């Protein structure tokens, strides 16, 4: 191939790569700086039982019974309302349990629906991360769930 032909091929490849759609980046759920914060002193004292039956919070993905997930991973949390009620979207609060605690709600706002939280690619540093999810139903009953994320290096 002549130098001008090689240059033309390289230019064509460069142009094709420049116009190719970029891979979507994972959304940062927890930063490395947040992950290094100390655990709260009262982590063992988290109460989640109430007298009435508020919405239930279930971790779907990553599998809470699994051995861990590599980041980025799909994060799916399901809300289950009871007795013909619905989850009040503005009541959902997601907190990373550290000292001080970190409000993750603004990062997840666009992924929260009445059925739960669905984040396609959550970027989380390796380690074990505890997240509290608080929800309220249309009758004012509160439900709380603890989501444990085990992230592999």
Named regions from a protein language model:
Residues 23-73:
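Short, compositionally biased P/S/T/A/G/V-rich stretches that sit at domain boundaries
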Residues 82-93:
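Solvent-exposed loop/turn segments flanking beta-strands in beta-repeat/beta-sandwich domains
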